[in-house]
Structures are given as structure tokens and as C-alpha cells.
């Protein structure tokens, strides 16, 4: 089976808008996002009043030079870091202002994350790695594993679910990471250089998979990448430069 082969949806279907979310409400909205860091005794402002909107099912690429603040922006949008100014709304509801415990709950239910390095736990099987967010959510082990198996089938790894990360190829490990990001049926997946550690052929297959899953499941993706060819396949391309986002396409 190729890296881009998807199996039938079966019981797995991601949700984009939660109950009570008005039609047309952006999945993710950042307004006036500002972030500063101390560097060499100086305040460095990496985000300067950034505005960004992501709609349901939309694929948005963020490009820019190394150190321009792309990962910082992704962390702020995902509630992993707090902005110095501005706010983030998730599914039309305040996200930045939530207390950390409540924000963690909302993040677990509405967002997925994929990183350059897969961050899979080496002692656990692919199935148990993917099931972990559902166990954190409070599902029983059998129920969490059933959800995990369904999404592994969706990414073409149903037959590899009992393998540990060390027994999988680089592309397979990243597909497991994508499955883990999707198992909770998030409205949006935030991906930080998800193909950065892969060769060109494998990277292309993983990228194809993410775009196809976005199309078939209606999940929004925000993808930070240095690969302009891959970025060009998204619905929009935004460039982060001098702390501001500029729309390139």
C-alpha cells in the first residue's frame, strides 16, 4: 500500500464545527497577536499584532525564514504559549483567556498537533500511541483502542497497529503521528514542519495524506513548512516576515 492510500472511512469521521457553533464561524481566529522574547538582554518582538483566520476544512500554509516566529505563532494559536497581547478564539469561543486546566481540555477535544519529530512513545505500539489522547479524555481502554484502530485504518496502517515505532519506517511513524492528531476528531490540526525529517519522496506521500484527510474529513490544517512546493498545494499561503503575516496566495 502506498503512503497516500486511504482506506474507507468506516466509523471514523472528524468533526469540524461543534454543536452550537454558528455557520460561517472560523475554526481558529487570532487577533492582534503579539509575542516578545528576551534575547541578549533585549526585547525581541517576533509577532507584531498578527491577525489570522482559519475556516472549516481550510488548508493554510505558513512559510518564512528560520527564526521568523512561525513555530511561536503555531504555539500561540494552539494555546501552548500565551501571547503578550491579542487573543485566540477556537470555534467562536474564547481560548486564550481560559485557565490552563480548561484550555487543556478544550485543546484535547478540538485541536490536533503534528511535529517535525513524531514524538511517539517508543515502548508503546502504534495503536496505544494513537489511543493515548482518548485515554486522557477519559475513554475506557477498549473504546480508546477502537477509535485508534479506526483512524489507523484511515491512514493505511491498520495492519501495522501492533508495531512499535522502532519497527516502522520514517514515513509510517509520521502517519501514526497524524493518526494520533486526528483520533479526537479535532476541528483543526496544527502541523509544525511535519515532513522536515523525511526524504522528498516520503515527504510528498505524507503531505498527500494530510491534504486528502483534510478533504475527506473536513478537518482544517495549519501547516508550517519551508517547502514552497508543498505549501503551494494548500488553499492559502501566508508568509511571516518582520513579525507580520502577509498573504502570498
From Swiss-Prot:
Keyword Lyase assigned: no
Keywords for this protein: ATP-binding, Cell inner membrane, Cell membrane, Membrane, Nucleotide-binding, Translocase, Transport
Major enzyme class: translocase
GO molecular function, one term: ATP hydrolysis activity
EC number(s) on file: 7.6.2.-
Record carries keyword Transmembrane: no
GO terms for biological process, alphabetical: lipoprotein localization to outer membrane; protein localization to outer membrane
Spans annotated as Disordered: 1-23
Lipid bilayer topology: Peripheral membrane protein
Places the protein is found: Cell inner membrane
Entries under SMART domains matching the protein: AAA
Family: Belongs to the ABC transporter superfamily. Lipoprotein translocase (TC 3.A.1.125) family.
Oligomeric and partner information: The complex is composed of two ATP-binding proteins (LolD) and two transmembrane proteins (LolC and LolE).
Function: Part of the ABC transporter complex LolCDE involved in the translocation of mature outer membrane-directed lipoproteins, from the inner membrane to the periplasmic chaperone, LolA. Responsible for the formation of the LolA-lipoprotein complex in an ATP-dependent manner.
The protein's name: Lipoprotein-releasing system ATP-binding protein LolD
Origin species: Cupriavidus metallidurans (strain ATCC 43123 / DSM 2839 / NBRC 102507 / CH34)
Lineage of the species this protein comes from: Bacteria, Pseudomonadati, Pseudomonadota, Betaproteobacteria, Burkholderiales
Amino acid at each position: 500500500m502506498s503512503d497516500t492510500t486511504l482506506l474507507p472511512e468506516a466509523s471514523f469521521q472528524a468533526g469540524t464545527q461543534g454543536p452550537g457553533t454558528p455557520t460561517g464561524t472560523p475554526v481558529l481566529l487570532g487577533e492582534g497577536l503579539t509575542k516578545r522574547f528576551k534575547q541578549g538582554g533585549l526585547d525581541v518582538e517576533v509577532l507584531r499584532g498578527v491577525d489570522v483566520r482559519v475556516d472549516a476544512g481550510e488548508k493554510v500554509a505558513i512559510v518564512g525564514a528560520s527564526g521568523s516566529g512561525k513555530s511561536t505563532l503555531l504555539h500561540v494559536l494552539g494555546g501552548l504559549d500565551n501571547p503578550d497581547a491579542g487573543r485566540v478564539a477556537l470555534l467562536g469561543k474564547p481560548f486564550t483567556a481560559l485557565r490552563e486546566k480548561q484550555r487543556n481540555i478544550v485543546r484535547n477535544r478540538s485541536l490536533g498537533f503534528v511535529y517535525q519529530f513524531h514524538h511517539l512513545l517508543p515502548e508503546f505500539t502504534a495503536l496505544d500511541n494513537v489511543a493515548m489522547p482518548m485515554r486522557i479524555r477519559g475513554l475506557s481502554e477498549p473504546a480508546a483502542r477502537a477509535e485508534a484502530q479506526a483512524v489507523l485504518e484511515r491512514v493505511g496502517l491498520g495492519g501495522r497497529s501492533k508495531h512499535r515505532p522502532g519497527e516502522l519506517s520514517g514515513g509510517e511513524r509520521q502517519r501514526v503521528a497524524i493518526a494520533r492528531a486526528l483520533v479526537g476528531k479535532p476541528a483543526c490540526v496544527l502541523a509544525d514542519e511535519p515532513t522536515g525529517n523525511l526524504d522528498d519522496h516520503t515527504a510528498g506521500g505524507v503531505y498527500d495524506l494530510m491534504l486528502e484527510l483534510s478533504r475527506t474529513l473536513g478537518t482544517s490544517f495549519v501547516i508550517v513548512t519551508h517547502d514552497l512546493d508543498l505549501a503551494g498545494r494548500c488553499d492559502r499561503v501566508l508568509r511571516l516576515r518582520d513579525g507580520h503575516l502577509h498573504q502570498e496566495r
